[in-house]
Amino acid sequence: MKKTLILIIVVFGINSFAISKETTFTNKIFEKSQEDGKTVVIHSWNKTCLTCAKQVKILDQAKKDFKDTIFLSFEQTKDKKIAKFLSIDYWTTIVVYKNNKEISRTIGQTNKEEIYSQIKTQ
């Protein structure tokens, strides 16, 4: 009985950290945004990653604060073609593009000020 209760707590505890998020990255949106001179923020995540969940919370707020910036994301383990296209090897990667160039890349960053600074980089 005790083992069953512990197992239930562990399973529900892990699932409570799962990210409910969808892949929004497409080549078409990425290329069009670049052509339009927009800043593009790309986030690589995994649904069971705690660091990714922290980043999602920050990036969701950033979408409201940086209205002219395009935010795209993809699930690293499911969307391997996107990861290869962008040369992204790890969950928790945030990449910023401006004027068809990568201007910033971080892995594992969860500090809001640092992420915002990365987005503001020109």
What are the residue ranges of the model-derived segments?
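Sec-dependent N-terminal signal peptides
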Residues: T4-G13
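Extracytoplasmic/secreted envelope proteins and their assembly/folding machinery
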Residues: N27, E31, V56-D60, K80-A83, ...
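Short active-site neighborhood of thiol/selenol oxidoreductases, capturing the structured segment around
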Residues: E35-K47
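Thiol-based oxidoreductase modules, predominantly thioredoxin-like and allied folds used
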Residues: S44, D68-K80
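Typically the conserved alpha-helix immediately C-terminal to a functionally engaged Cys/Sec
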Residues: T51-D65
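Structural micro-motif
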Residues: L86-V95
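Non-catalytic, surface beta->alpha helical segment in thiol-disulfide oxidoreductase systems
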Residues: K98-Q122
